[in-house]
């Protein structure tokens, strides 16, 4: 997480670019793996992280593009929650970490959105990609699920993209850390690239590096001798001399910045022809 001032400056610039209406930014929720209390590893929405910095599930935020005021919505952990999670900071404490003083319960978001809609103010939102987010936006805005994409804010899409494509010095440092993790993953894969090794052994070693020094892989690693198949996630092949191994993998740094490297490695001794191509 960066300083509170960083997030305040980002929100102020976003409000300036949009200029009118309310900007609704949805955080992600926990998603069940195979039953409600067993969830996938949590990954916060990247736009929420960029403007509000909190890597915690079930948060929502509104930014008034006219006044510049930001409101953070969420619920404090209950006693039942704390049994499982241990003591957690209150919402107002989380808000202070990212420069937001107006923190309200999640249910208060309904009233804020309803009031804005009665005033015919535009509600800007990005096209959602998770089912849970689609359902919540549909409920909040009174739109059928099929109408969410047509009602997306193109202005907001361009504003967010234009801001995020220019990286600050502290972001570049975070990207460098993600790059170094990716480098360690790929050099490990290169050293393991020997006949008889199972592809998943290499994939597992790479994931272990990403998890031990960062937040894990930035996407499911592709480790396959069948590089002709795009996004081949099957890693059950046994490495054979003379074959080529495609390795597409990257890591997510502790600051949620990601690397993505793709390399092809020779299994066994390279032929003269292969050595020529490797120098190109």
Regions found by a protein language model. Give the residues of each.
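Active-site neighborhoods and metal-handling regions in enzymes and metal-associated proteins
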Residues: 1-278
């Amino acid at each position: 997480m960066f300083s509170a001032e960083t997030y305040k400056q980002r929100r102020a610039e976003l409000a300036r670019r949009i200029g009118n209406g309310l900007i609704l930014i949805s955080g992600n929720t926990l998603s069940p793996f195979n039953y409600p209390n067993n969830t996938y590893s949590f990954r916060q929405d990247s736009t929420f992280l960029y403007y509000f910095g909190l890597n915690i599930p079930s948060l929502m935020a509104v930014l008034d593009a006219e006044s510049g005021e930001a409101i953070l919505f969420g619920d404090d952990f209950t006693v039942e929650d704390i049994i499982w999670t241990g003591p957690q900071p209150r919402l107002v404490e989380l808000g202070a970490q990212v420069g937001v003083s107006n923190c309200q319960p999640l249910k208060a978001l309904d009233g804020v959105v309803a009031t804005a809609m009665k005033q015919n103010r535009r509600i800007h939102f990005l096209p959602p990609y998770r089912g849970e987010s689609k359902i919540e936006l549909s409920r909040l805005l009174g739109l059928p699920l099929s109408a969410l994409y047509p009602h997306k804010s193109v202005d907001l899409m361009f504003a967010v993209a234009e801001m995020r494509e220019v990286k600050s010095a502290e972001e570049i440092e975070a990207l460098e850390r993600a790059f170094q993790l990716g480098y360690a993953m790929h050099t490990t894969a290169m050293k393991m690239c020997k006949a008889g090794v199972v592809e998943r052994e290499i994939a597992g070693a790479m994931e272990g590096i990403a998890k031990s020094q960062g937040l894990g892989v930035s996407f499911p690693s592709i480790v396959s001798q069948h590089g002709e198949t795009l996004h081949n996630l099957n890693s059950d092949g046994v490495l054979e001399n003379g074959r080529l191994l495609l390795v597409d993998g990257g890591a997510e740094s502790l600051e949620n910045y990601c690397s993505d490297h793709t390399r092809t490695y020779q299994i066994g001794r390279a032929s003269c022809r292969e050595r020529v191509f490797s120098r190109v």
